[in-house]
Amino acid sequence: MKTRDLHVISIRPLLPPAILIEELPLSEKGSVVVSRARKEVGHILDGEDDRLVVIVGPCSIHDPLAGLEYARRLEAVADELGEDLRIVMRVYFEKPRTTVGWKGLINDPHLDGSFVINEGLRLARRLLLDLVELGLPSGCEFLDPITPQFISDLVTWGAIGARTTESQVHRELASGLSMPVGFKNGTDGGVQIAIDAVRAAAHPHRFLGVTEQGLAGIVSTRGNPDCHVILRGGQDGPNYDTASVQKTLAALRDAGLPARVMIDTSHGNSDKDHRRQPAVARDIAAQIAQGEPGIIGVMLESFLVNGRQDLKDRKHLVYGQSITDACLGWEMTVPVLHDLAAAVRARRKVRQ
């Protein structure tokens, strides 16, 4: 009598990471872009660089062409504001779902339930390479210990989401990632699980993963010293206000960790209303302008077109508009970035 795979329909071969990396290699110029951006973000986390990290981009990438157009626009602004902001494009290919729904470009690149994951991995890597060649750093959320083998060499900053921060697997994964990683507070608003995650990820771990050849393996990590908390609000309301920020910074100090936080202007902090993101950003900017050194970064959900659309007919989607969470349109995004840059300049004067 069969006792295994009773609920499994099929298991298809996964492209080995080494094959995809050989097919779409990172150039020497590109490796310099990634390494330099990671170092810059690390210096900001350590307080050696007084700029602000800004993770800005679509809730999720569903159309690489629109993503690349957004990147070209963002790269120009990143150059303009580079003395005050280290802008990193949010490039999320995987979407954790509360129940069910489209799980992202890697999982379902054709948006039709065909789940051609090998092609999704190829599209994701190609877009990240395009961004690197533009000179624009990228930030991704990681949902499993396998996908990073295909794309992590191209990523400047990583995120562990609110639904997975408490997961041992994701803390172990973060301990081995080659870039700074942010842990979001839980969906209930609890910050302690993110603080615990930062502590855990700083230590060495052993866990199951895959090699570049696609074989199952036992991964041994050194621990990641460049992890931090992301405040994203929760069921009990937002936590971007001064009192919440100071409470979190104090909790980090009590835990023996660096007092540094990134703040997400979306999700629970905007009450899931994308139009509130500029107001949230203004509040954060005011705290920065008053001299607060513990705020090291801000996250914004932004795309070419304001709002969102349902994935009903993939042939008639609005170009440049999100199919997951609603985003700020480009015209509303640029003033927010300028406001944050002005806040950094004000903080610089206060702290001189």
Can you name each region flagged by the protein language model?
Residues 6-48:
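N- or domain-start disorder-to-order transition segments that initiate the globular core
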Residues 232-234, 239, 247-262:
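A contiguous, surface-oriented mixed alpha/beta subdomain in the mid-to-C-terminal portion of proteins
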Residues 303-348:
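Internal helix-turn-beta structural module
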Residues 53-66, 325:
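Conserved phosphate/anionic-ligand binding catalytic regions in large, soluble enzymes, centered on
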